């Protein structure tokens, strides 16, 4: 049999299904901070459904719970842990300006 006429066979790899991020016993509630904090980015943004691997209903409930927690000041609207490094950038530009003069 010619090499060009051989059927292309793809090797099958084993597939391991990931566990769902929300178990059946978990209650989606604005007070459940350990659950809610898993679905928020470092910046404080709500992660998308594709990233969270949630169903549409679960994502809707998580979004509502996060918004309620933000309004009640349980969660910040923005997480500003990363401060802008203005000191380095201004120091660099100030040094360049001083050299040109």
Swiss-Prot record:
What are the record keywords, sorted?
Chloroplast, Plastid, Ribonucleoprotein, Ribosomal protein, RNA-binding, rRNA-binding
SUPFAM superfamilies this protein is in?
Ribosomal protein S18
Subcellular localization(s) per the UniProt record: Plastid, Chloroplast
Q: Which GO terms describe its molecular function?
A: small ribosomal subunit rRNA binding; structural constituent of ribosome
The record's annotation in Pfam families points to: Ribosomal_S18
Spell out the coiled coil positions from the record.
none
- Which InterPro entries has this protein been placed in? Ribosomal_bS18, Ribosomal_bS18_CS, Ribosomal_bS18_sf
Protein family membership: Belongs to the bacterial ribosomal protein bS18 family.
Instruction: Outline the subunit composition.
Output: Part of the 30S ribosomal subunit.
In its UniProt entry, what is this protein called? Small ribosomal subunit protein bS18c
From which source organism is this entry?
A: Panax ginseng
């Amino acid at each position: 049999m010619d090499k060009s006429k051989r059927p292309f066979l793809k090797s099958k790899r084993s597939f391991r299904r990931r566990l769902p991020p929300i178990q059946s016993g978990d209650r989606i509630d604005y007070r459940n901070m350990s659950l809610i904090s898993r679905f928020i980015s470092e910046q404080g943004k709500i992660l998308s459904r594709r990233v969270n691997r949630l169903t549409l209903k679960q994502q809707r409930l998580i979004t509502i719970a996060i918004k309620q927690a933000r309004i009640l000041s349980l969660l910040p609207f923005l997480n500003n842990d990363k401060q802008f490094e203005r000191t380095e950038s201004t120091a660099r530009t100030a040094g360049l300006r001083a050299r040109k003069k």
